[in-house]
Each structure stands twice: as C-alpha cells, then as structure tokens.
Amino acid sequence: MLKITIITLGNKMPDWVNSGVNEYAKRFHDGIQIKLIEIPLLRRNKSSDLARILEKESALIKDALPANARLIALDMLGKSFSSEELALKLTQLQQISSHLCFIIGGPEGLSNEILTLCDERWSLSKLTLPHPLVRIILLESLYRAWSIINNHPYHK
C-alpha cells in the first residue's frame, strides 16, 4: 500500500477547499492511503519577525514528519512535471518508498532547514498559487498520474 501524507500550514479552510481535498482523496482506490496533516499558521502582523515565525513553523513541520517517508517539498524552484512525467515519477518512487510525504509551506514558503531535509523539491506551477488551492491541485495531479498508471479513463 502506498501512503501519501500531505503536511500543510494553514488555518481553518473554507468548505470548498475541504470538499476539493475530500473529493480527490476518496477517488484513490485500494492501495493508496491519503492523510492530511494541517499545522496552524502562526499569527502574523506588520511587526512580526518573519524569520522567527518561519523557524517556529519549521519546528512544527519537523515534529509532524512521518518516519521513513520520502520527503517532497513543494517549492517554486522545484522540478515541474507534465502529467505523463509525474506518472512515471510516481512509478519510480513506489520502487523506492511506500510512503511519500509532501510538504506545503505557508505564505513565506519553507525554511532552508526543511528544504534541506527533503529528498526532492517539486513545483506545481511557475505561478504563485494560494496555499489552500495547492492542496487540491496536488491531489488532482497525483490522482491524474495514478489514472495514467492504471489506464483509468480520467486522464483521457
């Protein structure tokens, strides 16, 4: 069984975000388990020390990392894939690990400490995306790749 954990920073999400996440998570059939870990964003204001906030959020992310998972940071500077390339990449990753952990940062992204811990860095787009939407785009992309691997008609 492939486990996919998504660690993300964020506060209470709108219903449409939760609906989108749940919709794609339930589409995966037997053999793939999806888990979302949401870490509350630390409070920010105009005088916030963003470096200190990033450091604290990094500690919370590190505490949530599952043991023995392949860590993949979502980062603007990461590698991007077409749907077919992502399907191939997922096939390769399943040979390496039975647990993939995707990490989505907050408004300031991820700290260098977290990026260094990760085995890979992926980018979903060159666009700046709202962090709540990234959850849905990631799951849809993974589902599409799974559909390609399994010759499911979703991708066609």
Swiss-Prot record:
S-adenosyl-L-methionine binds at residues 74, 105, 124-129. It is an enzyme of class 2 (transferase). It catalyses: pseudouridine(1915) in 23S rRNA + S-adenosyl-L-methionine = N(3)-methylpseudouridine(1915) in 23S rRNA + S-adenosyl-L-homocysteine + H(+). SUPFAM superfamilies: alpha/beta knot. The keyword Cytoplasm applies. Keywords: Cytoplasm, Methyltransferase, rRNA processing, S-adenosyl-L-methionine, Transferase. It is found in: Cytoplasm. Its main location: cytoplasm. Its EC number is 2.1.1.177. Belongs to the RNA methyltransferase RlmH family. Homodimer. This is Ribosomal RNA large subunit methyltransferase H.
